[in-house]
Design a protein with these regions (language model features):
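Extracellular/periplasmic solute-recognition and catalytic clefts
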Residues: 268-279, 406-421, 438-501, 512, ...
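Detector for C-terminal structural segments
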Residues: 23-175, 184, 188, 516-551, ...
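C-terminal motif of bacterial Sec signal peptides marking the signal peptidase cleavage site
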Residues: 16-19
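Append "and occasionally in soluble cytosolic enzymes with long acidic Gly/Pro-rich linkers
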Residues: 210-212, 224-225, 406, 416-418, ...
Length: 736
């Protein structure tokens, strides 16, 4: 009896404690990697039904703007991979709609889904002002034609020193020969140097972003023929008098070397994607060739071949590319004949060479290219290390364009270029005459002072109210010394997301973030009235936008914490750290119970960089905190403004139950290291970044993002622009 009374007394005491608000501490269980869930089948919807779908079959949800199609009795939601591919490969005329009409319809649906998914937050789209020394004549810039293009045709006034100093706030890295090698996108400044040192392209864009044949390099206009099997062949013949900067002759081999080498496992070993010839006939068989397995069959049923059927060398100055039927209907078909010459050793090594099948004229690469050696107990391709070394700016290889790199100072991020007297000029840029171009690093806070001291002659893409006003004032007061040119920017400054990791891997979180940044105010403050806001990846002056602006259905995400809370709660962000219902009066951060493919290994191990919040396991269920790890590039006035407008804004944090960490970073470490997860740029193997601010631009009239939304894991790391695999694109999600 005493024991029973004692138990009753203990129970009453416990009830009394709980009645006073004392709750039993929650017990977190260890994270179990075995609980992770991932897709096993990455077959895309587009690969399965894309060829069956025409634009007239598509249904558009008038409220959300999302697109659907029914094929063989199954209704599919069209994801980003599908729409980006259909936009450029499914544009055959339908009914009274032209190919352009069809393209515009796909483009609209693509923009609308992008707007729904919010893979990034456009913060401002501004006017750009290019400020330059008045000694420079004929400098004409446009949204598609930057100073690195314009300076080639420009001249220096007689009597002035025949040299120009270009400046950019984007760091140079020294990757001048192939600025995109091993990256998902090139560094803007590195790309400028690459443009200035490259030439003899078969195709070049003009000041309006339109592509035209470069007859300065071509012997005749390229031809195209649709073959009986639906493939399409482009035949290109170059002139016989083209030479590199060292005077060595350029032949057709130099035009096909890049596509050949970068479709092999050797280039992959050097850090390339290995997908340069992906759209060409015979790619799979050639890409599987290792140097010793010709004629074998891969585990995917592909017959390995030493020669690439889609690339042929017809004679010393004539070559052809044959595209598979899937890509024969490409909307921007002219670019299929685009090619540029490279020194053979750049990608083939000292002993590598292009070889030709005497019967078919198909190209391959010699045995020396595939040679291996022992390193650390493993067979490695010898040429892979040569490629890495040859890509350095100061390798002994020549350049093909109007300038050559004579020096690069990595400590000051300064490149010096000298005129290449052997380059005759081209149709787009003309012939260069400026003897020396120096490319320097600029910082917003000091660039105007450098300009007035003559330490830089051109400051490109000035933006921001204070900087713009200072530049215009300088020109107004000193018209004999300074000049400017300006244009509406085809692009925008943004807060980009890593959309496959942590809370920003979920659409509703990205929507909540865009709801809680007052973007019109941000744009007005930053640009000083010289800009506005866009709501997707488009240029308001583009033909597609102008054709669809009256019917496009996009959410402007007007500033509202209530709207943010609504989308979060609807998606399940309704818990606290104990797995109980979130109480905004006493809980700081919301949590979501993860399910399905949200239970990725990275999400199970997610935590804020300050270790304050992390995914927790309670009674077998996983709960993720609404914490965002933001990396802000510095020095950068956009970062400074985001600190106020977003990270330290109660409407974006405490009001909605979100926590935001801030990590200051330089551009290369933040973008390439943490965002792109490049170990060469400092990534340590542990995912951390959820958001980072940078910019995007549409530098050509060719609007093509096919493959940039791929769900193919073999292409994802190198091609994905926002690191998102749209669930609507997985064919397995529709299997009954």
């Amino acid at each position: 009896m005493k024991k029973v009374l004692a138990l009753i007394l203990v129970a009453l005491m416990m009830l009394s404690l709980f009645a006073c608000g004392k709750e039993k501490p929650v017990e977190y269980q260890p994270i179990d990697p075995a609980d992770a869930v991932s897709h096993k089948d990455h077959t895309s919807v587009y690969s399965e039904i894309g060829s069956k779908v025409t634009i007239d079959m598509v249904e558009e949800d008038k409220e959300t703007g999302l697109a659907y199609v029914t094929v063989d009795g199954t209704k599919y939601e069209l994801g980003m991979d599908f729409l980006s591919m259909a936009m450029v490969y499914n544009t055959a005329p339908v009914g009274n709609k032209t190919s352009t009409d069809v393209y515009n319809e796909w483009w609209k649906l693509y923009i609308q889904r992008w707007n729904y998914l919010v893979p990034e937050v456009p913060l401002y789209s501004n006017q750009y002002f290019d400020l330059y020394n008045a000694k420079i004549e004929g400098l004409v810039t446009t949204p598609y034609w930057g100073p690195a293009d314009a300076i080639v045709a420009a001249k220096v006034k007689t009597g002035e020193a025949n040299s120009v100093i270009l400046g950019s706030s984007t760091d140079l890295s020294g990757a001048f020969r192939d600025s995109a090698f091993g990256k998902s996108s090139p560094g803007a400044s590195d790309l400028d140097i690459q443009k200035l040192t490259s030439g003899y392209d078969t195709l070049m864009s003009d000041k309006n972003g339109e592509y035209n044949w470069n007859m300065s390099a071509l012997a005749e206009v390229p031809t195209s023929v649709v073959n009986e099997d639906g493939t399409i062949t482009y035949t290109i013949k170059i002139k016989k008098d083209l030479v590199f900067s060292d005077g060595s002759a350029i032949t057709a081999k130099h035009y096909v070397a890049y596509a050949l080498a970068n479709s092999t496992p050797v280039s992959v070993a050097a850090g390339a994607t290995g997908n340069a010839g992906l759209k060409l006939v015979g790619f799979a068989g050639f890409a599987a060739y290792t140097g010793t397995n010709n004629g074998e069959t891969t585990d995917k049923g592909v017959t390995v071949t030493k020669y690439f059927d889609g690339i042929k060398l017809l004679d010393d100055y004539t070559f052809s590319f044959t595209y598979t039927a899937d890509y024969a209907g490409y909307y921007y078909s002219i670019v299929n004949a685009a090619a540029s010459p490279v020194p053979l050793a750049l990608y083939l090594g000292a002993k590598g060479d292009v070889i030709v099948d005497p019967e078919t004229k198909a190209c391959g690469l010699n045995d020396a290219f595939y040679a291996t050696e022992q390193k650390d107990g493993k067979d490695v391709y010898t040429v892979a290390a040569e490629i890495v070394a040859n890509l350095k700016w100061n390798s002994a290889l020549p350049y093909s364009g109007p300038y050559v790199v004579s020096n690069y100072d990595a400590s000051s991020r300064t490149a010096t270029l000298k005129l290449n007297p052997k380059y005759p000029g081209d149709d787009a840029r003309g012939k260069a005459s400026i003897e020396t171009i120096t490319y320097v690093k600029l910082v917003d806070e000091t660039q105007m002072d450098m300009f007035q001291k003559g330490q830089v002659d051109i400051i490109a893409q000035i933006t921001g109210g204070d900087q713009t006003k200072a530049a215009l004032k300088l020109v107004d007061e000193n018209p004999e010394k300074y000049a400017e040119t300006h244009y509406d920017r085809a692009g925008y400054g943004k807060l980009g997301f890593r959309c496959d990791f942590g809370p920003t891997g979920m659409t509703e979180v990205r929507q909540a973030i865009i709801y809680t940044i007052n973007r019109p105010e941000f744009a007005q403050t930053f640009t000083g009235g010289y800009g506005a806001v866009v709501h997707g990846p488009y240029y308001p002056g583009s033909a597609a936008y102008l054709a669809t602006k009256d019917t496009i259905n996009i959410n402007q995400y007007n500033y509202s914490s209530d709207s943010a809370i609504a989308v979060l709660e609807a998606a399940g962000w309704i818990y606290n750290a104990s797995g109980k219902k979130f109480n905004p009066k006493k809980d700081d951060v919301r949590y979501k119970k993860l399910s399905g493919y949200e239970l990725s290994e990275d999400n199970l191990n997610f935590k804020s960089v300050d270790n304050k919040y992390k995914t927790v396991k309670i009674d077998g269920a996983y709960y993720m905190p609404l914490a965002v790890n933001w990396y802000g590039t510095q020095p950068n006035p956009v970062t400074d403004q985001l600190l106020t407008a977003w990270q330290n804004n109660p409407a974006a944090t405490t009001a909605i139950g979100m926590y935001i960490t801030y990590t200051s970073t330089d551009f290369n470490k933040g973008i390439y290291g943490e965002f792109c997860r490049s170990k060469e740029d400092g990534y340590d193997g542990t995912p951390k970044l959820n958001a980072v601010n940078f910019a995007t631009g549409f530098n050509s009239a060719v609007y093509d993002f096919s493959f940039n939304w791929t769900i193919d894991p073999d292409m994802y790391d190198n091609y994905s622009t926002a690191y998102i695999m749209d669930e609507a694109d997985f064919f397995e999600n529709y299997k009954k």
